[in-house]
Amino acid sequence: MSILPIIKGEYKKDYNLKHLTWFKVGGNAEIFFKPFDSADLKSFLIQNNKKLPITTFGSGSNIIIRDGGIEGVVIKLGKNFNNIEFLDNHLIVGSSCLNYNLAKFCQANAISGFEFLVGIPGTIGGGVVMNAGAYGSAFQDIIVQIEALDFLGNFLTFTNKEIGFKYRGNNLPKDLILLKAIFKANKGDSQNILLKMNKINTTRSSTQPIKERTGGSTFKNPVGCKSWELIDKAGLRGYRIGGASMSELHCNFMINNGNATAKDLEDLGNFVRQKVFEDSGVELNWEIKRIGKYV
């Protein structure tokens, strides 16, 4: 391990990440770093100069941390990166702000177009990276620009076009840490916005296992079909490996039934991919990220 950069924030060594993920599984971070602010993060990156490997971490909602843990430095942006500012008909939002909190802010301030965020777990930063979407809307529809640091500490901006949004992804460089996202704010009716959000919440609670230890949609939808339909057709609704299973309620959701390991979850996902391909000839691609050392 190289000498760690001098910082204002906080380092924790051999830090268990399990409690930070929605699945509640996984190993330790060799070094866990919460920067004090963007200047602190920039200073760390400049001093590090890519010597130590870096992994960024959001709310842990769509990720499997493998049981062998993560080498190098895991960076998690905290409360100093979750601000929401309404300025000149734009919203300037910190990357660690929860999607749900931005949706509630917009409802309270009669800003329309953000209702779908109430049904998407995770942070704004993760939503941009994944081009997260639901109920007919996605991040690509509302983003104007993002601000970021690369792993050398250079400050960069990208417009919506430069981000290169695609289905559940983008064409941004991989060595970026998102700081802020800027959105166009369109005025709407607060009561109508609330009605839309309530409808989304009702639909989610009746069709998704939101009270379980899950990571959201496991696989991206292939062109022209739904992953859950292919999984169901292959007879895998409720299928179980160890402490992990495909949800009975929505079979594109994996669940930790209480004693699953990260290996159980990843093995289950790969088994489902194999069986769906054998049954339908369609290759499912992971939507949930898997990071760390597989053991």
Swiss-Prot record:
Entry keyword Glycoprotein: no
Cofactors: FAD
E.C. designation(s): 1.3.1.98
Catalyzed chemical reaction(s): UDP-N-acetyl-alpha-D-muramate + NADP(+) = UDP-N-acetyl-3-O-(1-carboxyvinyl)-alpha-D-glucosamine + NADPH + H(+)
Gene that this sequence comes from: murB
Protein name: UDP-N-acetylenolpyruvoylglucosamine reductase
InterPro entries registered for this protein in UniProt: FAD-bd_PCMH (IPR016166), FAD-bd_PCMH-like_sf (IPR036318), FAD-bd_PCMH_sub1 (IPR016167), FAD-bd_PCMH_sub2 (IPR016169), MurB (IPR003170), MurB_C (IPR011601), MurB_C_sf (IPR036635), Oxid_FAD_bind_N (IPR006094)
Leading EC class: oxidoreductase
GO MF, one annotated term: UDP-N-acetylmuramate dehydrogenase activity
Subcellular location per the Swiss-Prot or TrEMBL entry: Cytoplasm
Pfam families (UniProt xref): FAD_binding_4 (PF01565), MurB_C (PF02873)
GO cellular component labels: cytosol
Pathway(s) it belongs to: Cell wall biogenesis; peptidoglycan biosynthesis
Domain FAD-binding PCMH-type: 24-188
PROSITE patterns associated with the record: FAD_PCMH
Superkingdom to which the source organism belongs: Bacteria
